[in-house]
A protein has these predicted regions:
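N-terminal loops that bind phosphate or other acidic moieties
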Residues: 2-119, 123-345
Length: 345
């Protein structure tokens, strides 16, 4: 029986490599052989995971993140493409500052260095307006230019293009197919994990729709915030693709191709998918959902929390539960031992 173990990070608790080491040790203690693959869709920790698949660092640059803290950012050379992970600067774990007081402006400092930008795992919910404010769009409150943070959205009365504006030619890796606005919008789906309550979600969503209309008045071809994938990284994908002209690409599919995993996924009888939380959004562009779609063998879920109504998509489900947030290693070992009992029957 050929077994594959795939792991993304367990955000806030365990890295993909830490998960794999725990599972590997438990399997080896029970004489179970398997192949192990850290995986990513271009979001949080994607640089680390790409490197574990042999991708090399091209150079390191110093850039200030969304709260002004200087970070060392690795630029990876992926088949000649220079890749940068956006969550290194705007990541959900970078700061506890209220997300309504944050935006994506800092990313303007890495644009010129990159060919491919990975989105996902962001702390921001600004529709990418912060980045646009540094790339040739001015946001006005009356006659005064204003910083387009969500806390200022209601004040924005007009948007104008200035001489700095130009289109870009870059690949943007998205970790979700969810749109910025419309049914199941990015702010609605991912806002709660970034600290937004229902009132804030509603206010930000309405203002994003209003401001995208203001932006649209500057273009003959109207930007579309309902397009698939535009919701990635709090709408940063919308700004990069619909305004700046970049190409959205599935981060998972890009990873499968560049890591060589594409040709291996269906060579296993059993696949074990490890993720911190599996829910409906996991099937809307996340790497685990993409593996599940491709895999023709038996699949098991091993992870933190399973929060999806259909449990039949896996042969069985092994969760750490809420206790996994407090003692992640201990609970993952316990869940893995239960999985071992299942696959050795």
């Amino acid at each position: 029986m050929n077994i594959a173990v795939y792991s993304d990070k367990f955000s806030g608790t365990l890295s993909a490599s830490e998960v794999i080491e725990i599972v590997k040790e438990t399997f080896q203690n029970n004489s179970i052989k398997a192949s192990y693959f850290p995986v990513t869709d271009g979001g949080e920790d994607s640089s680390t995971i790409f490197k574990e698949h042999g991708i090399e660092v091209q150079e390191t640059i110093n850039v200030k993140d969304l709260v002004g803290i200087e970070k060392q950012i690795e630029l990876l050379n992926i088949s000649g493409d220079i890749f940068v992970e956006s969550s290194l600067l705007i990541g959900i774990n970078n700061t506890n500052v209220d997300t309504t007081d944050l935006n994506t402006a800092c990313l303007s400092e890495i644009i010129e260095f990159s060919d491919v930008i990975g989105l996902g795992g962001s702390r921001t919910n600004d529709g990418g307006f912060g980045l646009l404010s540094k790339m040739g769009l001015d946001f006005f409150a009356g006659k005064e230019i204003i910083d387009p943070k969500p806390c200022n959205f209601e004040k924005i009365t007009s948007v104008e293009i200035n001489d700095k504006f130009e289109k870009l030619n870059k690949k943007i890796l998205v970790d979700t197919f969810i749109p910025l606005v419309g049914k199941r919008s990015a702010i609605e789906v991912f806002g709660p994990q970034k600290g937004l309550d229902k009132e804030s979600i509603n206010n930000i969503s309405l203002n994003i729709e209003r401001i995208t209309d203001l932006i649209s008045s500057n273009f003959k071809e109207k930007p579309d915030a309902t397009k698939k994938g535009t919701g990635a990284a709090g709408g940063l994908a919308f700004a990069l693709s619909e305004i700046l002209g970049c190409n959205l690409v599935s981060g998972a599919e890009y990873f499968f191709d560049k890591s060589g995993l594409e040709s291996k996924i269906n060579s296993f009888d059993v696949s074990i998918l490890c993720e911190g939380k599996f829910d409906k959004s996991s099937l809307e562009g996340k790497v685990m959902g993409q593996i599940l779609n491709k895999n023709k063998g038996i699949s098991y879920f091993l992870g933190g929390v399973y929060d999806y109504e259909d449990r039949e998509i896996f042969k069985d489900i092994f969760e750490c539960g809420e206790a996994g947030l407090v003692e992640p290693k201990k609970e993952l070992i316990s869940a893995t031992k239960k999985l071992v009992n299942q696959i050795t029957i």
